[in-house]
């Protein structure tokens, strides 16, 4: 399984993906995934969560997750790590 790292304290990205399967992977950081549009399934730690417009998911360090994208989906990803949290307190 792929393990992703974040090389800066904070990052925001927008993406649009057509029907596909995004393989299961793990993070060393926090990620907020906001669904702007589209439908599919988000798998988090082997739990299935159908999604559609307006859904928000929080992925924490060590969680595994993947997507089954059923219709073209637009995402907003907000990624941050412990350094960002500690510097904001």
Predicted regions and their residues:
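Glycine-rich, highly charged phosphate/nucleotide-binding loops
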Residues: 59
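Ligand-binding loop in jelly-roll beta-barrel domains
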Residues: 62-85
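Generic protein-terminus/edge-of-domain signal
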Residues: 1-56, 69-71, 83, 89
């Amino acid at each position: 399984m792929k393990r992703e790292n974040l090389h800066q304290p904070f990052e925001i990205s927008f993406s649009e993906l057509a029907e596909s399967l995004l393989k299961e992977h793990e993070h060393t950081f926090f990620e907020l995934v906001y669904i702007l549009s589209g439908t599919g399934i988000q798998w988090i730690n082997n739990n299935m969560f159908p999604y559609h417009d307006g859904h928000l998911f929080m992925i924490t360090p060590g969680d595994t997750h993947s997507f089954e994208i059923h219709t073209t989906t637009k995402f907003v990803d907000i990624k941050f790590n412990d350094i960002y949290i500690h510097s904001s307190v």
